[in-house]
A protein has these predicted regions:
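N-terminal Sec/SRP start-transfer signal
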Residues: 1-37
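A general structural signal for well-ordered alpha-helical segments in protein cores
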Residues: 6, 21-24, 125, 240, ...
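Hydrophobic alpha-helical membrane-associated segments
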Residues: 35-46
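Hydrophobic, regular-secondary-structure patches
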Residues: 44-114, 120-143
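Envelope-exposed proteins and targeting segments
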Residues: 61-63, 90, 109-113, 145, ...
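Short acidic/glycine-enriched loop/turn elements at secondary-structure junctions
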Residues: 101-193, 219-221
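Mechanotransmission and gating elements of multispan inner-membrane complexes involved in transport
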Residues: 171-177, 181-254
């Protein structure tokens, strides 16, 4: 039956009587379907490409799991539940971070930034070195602390990686009172050299982020063992959904206690 149908379709489509209305309608219909199908394939290919691009960008700088406090602003990394998470076999990289707003100044230019203090194992969590556009991602060489700036921040400040001049970071003294007689004492400041710039093609990072060592961030913002978030990377064999359920159960039990 299918063979007969194909023969009939072939005869009407390629009949020598090309002036036939049936032939004309058939050709127009076939062309219309072909063009529509081709356009759909191209569109899906483009969307698939965008999905892969966005996914790869997020995987370069975002953690798989991010733990933030339900109440308040910080978590204590020495709390029993937090220390327990760090020991789980499913956790490949355990990274406490501090994220706070600050003012960044370079020569006669300044702009607000989101300072992110990270420990030495941050490259194992984020692979940020893969999106570095200039310099080398390095936060400490054993003697000097460094900052890595989003490419938008660096551009607006007019600073480049490995500049001989440091940027200055200022944040309000979180624990002290405002000194009206000498307002400068109400701020904590750090002079720090730029080791690299990075581009994630996401404004939330490129135009705001300044990454510094966790120890320096804790000094600037008057923290000791606290972190504003815990970022995790899981082992390749770990089911992310199952891990999230396990994590929620632990944290809920801890909060209830």
């Amino acid at each position: 039956m299918n063979r007969l149908a194909r023969k009939i379709a072939w005869r009407y489509l390629f009949s020598k009587k090309s002036h036939s209305a049936i032939n004309a309608i058939s050709i127009v219909s076939v062309c219309g379907v072909a063009i529509t199908t081709l356009a759909l394939v191209c569109t899906l290919s483009v969307y698939n490409g965008f999905t892969e691009l966005i996914g790869s960008l997020y995987s370069q700088i975002d953690p798989q799991i991010k733990i933030t406090p339900l109440q308040g602003k910080t978590l204590d990394t020495e709390e029993e539940a937090i220390e327990q998470i760090a020991e789980w076999n499913e956790v490949k990289t355990f990274t406490p971070v501090i994220e706070e707003n600050a003012l960044c100044i370079y020569k006669d230019r300044q702009r607000p930034v989101l300072v992110k203090g990270v420990p030495d194992n941050y490259t194992e969590l984020s692979h940020i070195q893969d999106i570095v556009t200039s310099g080398t991602f390095q936060l400490n060489d054993g003697r000097i602390d460094y900052v890595s700036l989003g490419i938008g921040v660096a551009g607006q400040l007019g600073v480049v990686a490995n500049s001989p001049y440091p940027v200055e970071l200022y944040a309000p003294n979180r624990l002290g009172k405002v000194n009206l007689a000498n307002p400068s004492q109400s701020f904590n400041g750090r002079r720090i050299f730029v080791s690299s710039t990075f581009c994630a093609n996401q404004a939330i990072y490129d135009d705001q982020l300044a990454i510094i060592p966790l120890s320096t961030a804790r000094e600037m913002f008057s923290y000791t063992t606290e972190a504003t978030a815990i970022e995790l990377r899981l082992t390749p064999t770990t089911n992310e959904n199952e891990f999230a359920k396990k994590l929620s159960c632990l944290l809920y039990t801890s909060d209830a206690a």
